[in-house]
Swiss-Prot record:
Disulfide bonds: none annotated. It comes from Saccharolobus solfataricus (strain ATCC 35092 / DSM 1617 / JCM 11322 / P2) (Sulfolobus solfataricus). It comes from the Archaea. Signal peptide: none annotated. This is UPF0284 protein SSO2213. CDD domains: DMB-PRT_CobT. One of its GO terms (molecular function) is nicotinate-nucleotide-dimethylbenzimidazole phosphoribosyltransferase activity. Belongs to the UPF0284 family. InterPro entries: Nict_dMeBzImd_PRibTrfase, Nict_dMeBzImd_PRibTrfase_arc, Nict_dMeBzImd_PRibTrfase_sf. Gene3D superfamilies: 3.40.50.10210.
Length: 347
């Protein structure tokens, strides 16, 4: 139920781990048509906080339903919570810079929400603070764990990831995925091309111009952690790995990306090309949701949502621990049914 790329099968994941969910927002998500990671562009700023609340509590406090797409498809946090129920992992929420903060305990990296990358995403001071505090958190986690899994939640994060990869010199134009089956590549390209005009020469200044708080937070934690790291995400995690590579080229040997089959098989993108360029190994979960009893879950098989909140990495961790596809889908269906029954989901 897991496919390995670039020698990823040699990476050992069958040990105790901590799940770290890094959340943040970027004003890029307010651009109409760019992301479906929220029912409306304005609601995308609530998605990261609500995702975090659902993973930890099984319900949301910041909004009255779990995050859904404009057509009602549920957040991948559902897959993450179901998968992690089969593990004994510690779950930690880290706020790198979210406009809406979750109503649960979390660790704050003292960052700031990302602004529009066409102007200036972050101040250089906040870039340094997010990375430095992320490194410190990674170092502290090293005292208790040999393995961590890092997930992300930031609507429009694939657009900032593409801008970040291009700013760091990678061939990334039109290679990032989308939560929609109809990847808005033309709009993404237009936004990113505008963001990349008059880029400064200094790499940190470039990150401040076009990146987002989550990419920086994930990179910082990864740089500080002394053990093995599973970056649980899609094309965004290739950008996080690229930032790590800017600071410490020796670190990538300890990092692997764990994602979903919907990302690696996405014909509108090329995640594997990005991973190969950066030099990071990839595992893909072959989770099959076509047997789900819920149409909203089966829709994932049509290319909707694809990844987020560490869904791919979490399902990989469940599979490695002997959980079957049918058992995992039953758990996902059970959680979805609970949401429908509690009116914590608009259907």
């Amino acid at each position: 139920m897991i496919k390995a790329y670039f020698g990823a099968e040699t990476f050992t994941l069958n040990k105790d781990f901590a799940y770290i969910l890094v959340i943040g927002t970027t004003d890029v998500s307010l651009i109409p048509g760019l992301t479906i990671a929220g029912a409306t562009p304005e609601l995308t700023h609530f998605t990261p906080a609500a995702d975090a609340e659902y993973v930890i509590l099984g319900k949301c406090k910041s909004i009255n339903t779990i995050p859904v797409s404009p057509t009602g498809i549920p957040t991948p946090a559902l897959l993450t919570r179901a998968s992690l129920s089969f593990t004994k992992s510690l779950k930690i929420v880290v706020n790198a810079g979210s406009r809406i903060t979750p109503k649960i305990p979390y660790i704050d990296l003292q960052g700031e929400p990302g602004k529009d990358i066409r102007k200036q995403a972050l101040s250089i001071e906040k870039v340094n603070i997010i990375i430095e505090n992320g490194i410190k958190l990674g170092e502290e986690l090293s005292n208790e764990y040999e393995l961590i899994m890092i997930g992300e939640s930031i609507p429009a994060g694939t657009t900032t990831a593409m801008a970040t990869l291009l700013a760091l010199g990678y061939d990334a134009m039109d290679k990032v995925s989308s939560a929609s089956p109809d990847n808005p590549k033309e709009l993404k390209r237009k936004v990113v091309e505008e963001a990349l005009r008059n880029l400064p020469t200094d790499p940190l200044q470039r990150l401040a111009k076009v990146s987002d708080p989550v990419l920086l937070g994930v990179a910082g934690i990864s740089l500080g952690f002394r053990g093995k790291i599973l970056l649980a995400g899609g094309t965004q995690m290739t950008a996080a790995a690229a930032i790590v590579n800017e600071f410490d080229k020796s670190k990538l040997k300890d990092i692997i990306i764990g994602t979903t089959k919907w990302i690696v098989e996405d014909k509108s993108a090329d995640m594997l090309s990005l991973a190969k360029q950066v030099g990071v190994k990839v595992l893909a979960s072959m989770l099959d949701l076509s047997i789900s009893i819920h149409e909203g879950i089966r829709t994932y098989e049509k290319g909707y949502v694809k990844e987020g909140v560490g869904a791919g990495g979490s399902t990989i961790m469940a599979f490695i621990r002997g959980v079957s596809n049918s058992t995992l889908v039953r758990k996902i269906d059970e959680l979805y049914s609970e949401l429908v029954g509690s009116n914590n989901l608009n259907t």
